[in-house]
């Protein structure tokens, strides 16, 4: 697989479109960090790391509105890819839907949102947009 992050986002997107409650994805440290950010920002209900085999899996419980069954995630968009990396400095940090969404950035200090990276004044690779 050439782009495991794109595969992870696609699995989440497909589960959302199929109205699944839980999706299971192969684990990696970067996927764990992205999942943690999605949980902290309220885009997913819960997550659990399951140690099975050499890699393990991440079980992600998707978050839906209880009244009209609308998902908390409207769009997951991969920005940087292995063939064309997209980097940004802290002064040029992207604003997703005028601050309503988040950009997930991989920095030298770890994976964080665009707002956290701007506060720390560090740039990095723009992994994806979530809104």
Swiss-Prot record:
What are the protein's GO molecular function terms? rRNA binding; structural constituent of ribosome
What's the short name of a Pfam family annotated to this entry? Ribosomal_S8
Q: Which GO terms describe its cellular component?
A: ribonucleoprotein complex; ribosome
Q: Which GO terms describe its biological process?
A: translation
Kindly give the SUPFAM superfamilies that the UniProt entry links to this protein.
Ribosomal protein S8
Top-level taxon in the UniProt lineage: Bacteria
Report keywords, A-Z.
Ribonucleoprotein, Ribosomal protein, RNA-binding, rRNA-binding
Kindly indicate whether the keyword RNA-binding belongs to this entry: yes
Its function, per the record, reads: One of the primary rRNA binding proteins, it binds directly to 16S rRNA central domain where it helps coordinate assembly of the platform of the 30S subunit.
Family matches, as NCBIfam families? PRK00136.1
The Swiss-Prot or TrEMBL record describes its family as follows: Belongs to the universal ribosomal protein uS8 family.
Q: How does it assemble?
A: Part of the 30S ribosomal subunit. Contacts proteins S5 and S12.
The protein's name is Small ribosomal subunit protein uS8
Q: Which organism is it from?
A: Bacteroides fragilis (strain ATCC 25285 / DSM 2151 / CCUG 4856 / JCM 11019 / LMG 10263 / NCTC 9343 / Onslow / VPI 2553 / EN-2)
């Amino acid at each position: 697989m050439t782009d495991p992050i794109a595969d992870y986002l696609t699995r989440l997107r497909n589960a959302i479109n199929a109205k699944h409650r839980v999706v299971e994805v192969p684990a990696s440290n970067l996927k764990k960090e992205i999942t943690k950010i999605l949980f902290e920002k309220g885009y997913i209900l819960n997550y659990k790391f399951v140690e099975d085999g050499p890699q393990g899996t991440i079980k992600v419980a998707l978050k839906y509105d209880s009244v009209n069954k609308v998902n908390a995630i409207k769009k997951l968009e991969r920005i940087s890819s292995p063939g064309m990396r997209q980097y940004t400095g802290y002064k040029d940090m992207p604003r997703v839907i005028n601050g309503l969404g988040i950009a997930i950035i991989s920095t030298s200090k770890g994976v964080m949102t665009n707002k956290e990276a701007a506060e720390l004044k560090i740039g990095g690779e723009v992994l994806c947009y979530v809104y």
